[in-house]
Amino acid sequence: MSDNRNSQVVTQGVQRAPNRAMLRAVGFGDDDFTKPIVGLANGFSTITPCNMGIDSLATRAEASIRTAGAMPQKFGTITISDGISMGTEGMKYSLVSREVIADSIETACMGQSMDGVLAIGGCDKNMPGAMLAMARMNIPAIFVYGGTIKPGHLNGEDLTVVSAFEAVGQHSAGRISEAELTAVEKHACPGAGSCGGMYTANTMSSAFEAMGMSLMYSSTMAAEDEEKAVSAEQSAAVLVEAIHKQILPRDILTRKAFENAIAVIMAVGGSTNAVLHLLAISRAAGDSLTLDDFETIRAQVPVICDLKPSGRYVATDLHKAGGIPLVMKMLLEHGLLHGDALTITGKTIAEQLADVPSEPSPDQDVIRPWDNPMYKQGHLAILRGNLATEGAVAKITGIKNPQITGPARVFESEEACLEAILAGKIQPNDVIVVRYEGPKGGPGMREMLAPTSAIIGAGLGDSVGLITDGRFSGGTYGMVVGHVAPEAAVGGTIALVQEGDQITIDAHARKLELHVSDQELKERKEKWEQPKPLYNKGVLAKYAKLVSSSSVGAVTDLDLF
C-alpha cells in the first residue's frame, strides 16, 4: 500500500482537482501529490520560556520531512504556562489545555487526512495532550520535546522557577529580604526551555523516551543547544520511515511500554502528574492502566537519580551523566524494563540500549550506583482510606516524617489556603485540606505549588501535611497528597471534613484516614449539599460537565454514550 494511504482521498482523482488547487497554493507541485502528508503540530508560543524556542525546531523538522520525501503541513496548537498561571484563576485552564491540545491535533490531522504527525511541545500539558491525540488517531507519530531550560545561578547555587516560589514563602516568614527575593526572581529562569528539575515537563518527556515515542537522549537536551535542533531533524526522518513501515502508535503504546514509562518515572523521581497523564493516555491507546499498577511498580523500582525538586540536580545534569538511556539500561539489567517493547525507530528497547553502559560513571553523582540508590523504593505512592476510597497520589520520599496525625485546617480554595500560610496561621502538625479544587470542582484541578512552596519557605515542610482533590506541580515536595478521589464536588469524603478533625497521612502504610466514625460521616453526608457549578458557559463549564475522576485520568471522553 502507498505511503499516502490517508491523504490520497484529497490528492488523487479527477474529482479532487479543487482540493489539489488549494494544495498548490501552499506549495505543492505536480510530483508532491503522491507523497505522504505529515502534520507538524507546532506548540510555539511566546507565552512561556518553555515554548519560545520551538519554532526554530519546527523549521528544522519541516526541512527534514521534505528531505525524507514527504510533504510537511505545519499548524499551531496552544499552550498554557503553568508557572505563570500558578496560584491564579488561570491555572484552572491548565489541565483543560491538555484536552484542547489533544482535540486540536486530532482535528487538524483527521480533518486534513494526514498520513503522520510530528508534534513539538514544551510546557507540561503539551506532552500528554499530543500523546492523547496520537493514541486516538493511530497514525504514525513521533513527539519532539522542546528541551529543558538551563539552570539559573545565584551565589553559587543552581536555581529553577521553584526557587522563586519557595523564596516567596521565605520572604513571608522573614527569612530573606525583599532584595534577596528579587535577586532570585531575576536569576531563576535564564532563557528558553521547560522548567529544569524533574518536574512535570521533563517527567513526561522522559516517559515518552522510555515508551519509544521519542528518540533516545532527546528528553534531557537543553532547549538552546544545537543537538536539540539536530534531534528534531532526526525525529522527522525517523517519522517518515515509520510511515513507510506503518509503525503505529498503538504498536508502541502497549502495556509493556506503559510499565517501562512508570519504571523510569520512579527511577528518576518524577512528577505526580505522570500518574494522571499515563492513566489518560493508556485509555486512549486501548489499554486500562490503574492506580494499582503504579503501586506495584513503585514497590520494585528504586529512585536512582538525585534530581530536583527533592534532590540537587537538574535535567541538563542528568543529560551529561548519561541521560534517560543510562537509567533505562540499569533498569533493563535488573529485570525492571521490558526490552522487547517496540520503539518508533522499528527497533526494540533492548536493541536501542545495546551500546549504552550498564553502570553510571563514578565521576558523577547525578545517577547513583544500583547498590546505593537515593531510596530503595519508588516515590509515587497510591494512598487509600476513608478519605480517598478511589485513591490518592503522594510523593513519599524526601520527607523526614512519613507519618503525621493532626488537626484538619480546612480551606475551600487554594487562595484561602495560601493567605493563611503567608499570614502565619498554620502551625506544626497541622494537616491542611484544600478542597473543591478537583477536576469538576475547580474545575480544572489546579496545582498547589504556591501553597506547598510557601510551606517549605516558611520552614514547615517537615511538620505540616497537605491533602487536596487538586494536583501538585512537579516542583512540589513534602508531606503532600493530591488527586484525592472521589473529589469534594461529587460528595467525596474530603467534602465532609470539618475544621479540627483528626487526619492521618501514613506514607509507609499508604493510608489516608479521617478519624471520624462511619455514623458521623453518614450524618454529615445527609446534610451536605452539592455546590452549584461555578461556570455555566464556556470551556470550563463544558470541561466540568464532561471530565471524569482523577482516578481514571481526568479524561473528557469516558462513557460518553
Swiss-Prot record:
Organism whose genome encodes this protein:
Acaryochloris marina (strain MBIC 11017)
What is the protein's name according to its record?
Dihydroxy-acid dehydratase
UniProt-annotated binding residues for [2Fe-2S] cluster: 50, 123, 195
Q: Which gene encodes it?
A: ilvD
Q: Which residues are noted in the entry as Mg(2+)-binding? A: 82, 124-125, 447
* Gene3D superfamilies, A to Z: IlvD/EDD C-terminal domain-like
Source species taxonomy:
Bacteria, Bacillati, Cyanobacteriota, Cyanophyceae, Acaryochloridales
Q: In which pathway does it act?
A: Amino-acid biosynthesis; L-isoleucine biosynthesis; L-isoleucine from 2-oxobutanoate: step 3/4; Amino-acid biosynthesis; L-valine biosynthesis; L-valine from pyruvate: step 3/4
Task: Tell me which InterPro entries the record gives.
Answer: DHAD_IlvD/Edd, Dihydro-acid_dehy_C, DihydroxyA_deHydtase, DiOHA_6PGluconate_deHydtase_CS, ILV_EDD_C, ILV_EDD_N, IlvD/EDD_N
What is any one GO biological process for this UniProt entry?
A: L-valine biosynthetic process
- Subunit composition and interactions: Homodimer.
Spell out which residues are annotated as carrying N6-carboxylysine.
125
What cofactors are annotated for this protein?
[2Fe-2S] cluster; Mg(2+)
